[in-house]
C-alpha cells in the first residue's frame, strides 16, 4: 500500500480470490490500484519466463526489452492522465513496472544453466546488461520494496558468480557465501541496507544447507563486515543454538505442553520412533504453509513422526488440518529454550534409539529431503 499525506483509502476484497479481487477506493486509490495491476501482471509474466529462461541470450534480452518498452508506455500513459502526480509515486510506479524484468535478466544466467544440457552459464556480451545504466543500486528508500530489493539481490548474486563461481546446484559453497558477503560490502553504500543484506545472506545460506555443520569463514566474514550489534547478537545466538544440539548424540529430554495443557516429556513422546521435531513461530511460517508442508512430508516419508512445537506458544494456538496430538508448545521454563535463544525455527531429526541425526535442518529447504530419506529408511 502506498500512502501520501491526506490520502484516505478503503479496500474491498474477496478472501476466496484475494489478489485478483483487491480493489481500492477513496483518495489515493488510483495509485494503489495500478500497483496491484503491476503485481498481477508480474505474476503472469513469471510463468512466461519459465520458457524464456531456456532461450539463447539474444532472444531472451529481446523479450525483456520488448516487455520493458510496454511497461514504459504504461508509465507514460499514467503520467499523461495524472499530470500532477508526485515524483515519489512516479519512482515507485516505474520500479514496480520495470524492476521485476531487470531482476529476471539478472537471474537469467543461473536459470539458463539450470535448464541447459551442459549446466553451464551462457556466453553474454557486455550489451546484455545495458539496462543497468538506468539503475541505481543504492536507493535507500526503496530497499524494503520487493521489486527493488529482489533486483538488488539478484544483481549481487550475479556479480558474485562473475568472480568465477560455477552454477550452484543445491547448496552455496562456503567460498561463494564469503565472496557474496564481500560483494555486498563493496556494492552497497548505505549501512542499514548493507547490514540487512549481510544478515539475510549468511542466515539464509545456513538454512538452505539444512545441516548442523557450521562453515566458520562466512560467519567470521559477516562479523567482520556488519556494523549492527543487534544483527551480530542474533547471528551469534543462531550459532550457539546450532552447537547446543550435537549430531550422533542422544537427544536431551525437555518438557513440552500439549493442547490439553498438560506437561509432557519429549523423549517419551518420540520413544522408539523416527521423529522430526519442528520448532516454529508465526513470524517465519504461516500456519497454512506448515499444514501443507507437514502433509507433503508425511506422504513422502511415512515412517517418521512429525512433531510441531511452537516456541513461546499457548494451548489455544493449534494448527488446523494436522493431527493435534502431534502439536505442542514450550513456555519460557522449558529446557528447550537453551537451544532456541534466537527464536528461529529449526528441525531436529532423531532416530528410533533417540540419537540426533541432524541437529539443525530447515523446514522449507529442499536439502532437508536427503536427511529425511535416510531417516525414513532406517
Report each predicted region and the residues it spans.
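A non-transmembrane, solvent-exposed segment enriched in polar/low-complexity residues
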Residues: 1-84
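N-terminal, charged low-complexity regulatory/assembly segments
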Residues: 48-179, 183
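Alpha-helical repeat scaffolds
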Residues: 113-132, 176-185, 214-224, 232, ...
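Charge-dense, extended regions
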Residues: 169-200, 204, 208, 212-241, ...
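N-terminal "domain-start" segment that seeds a small globular fold
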Residues: 232-267
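Short active-site neighborhood of thiol/selenol oxidoreductases, capturing the structured segment around
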Residues: 264-294, 307
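Short, internal strand/loop/helix patches
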Residues: 319-353
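Thiol-/selenol-based redox modules, centered on thioredoxin-like
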Residues: 352-378
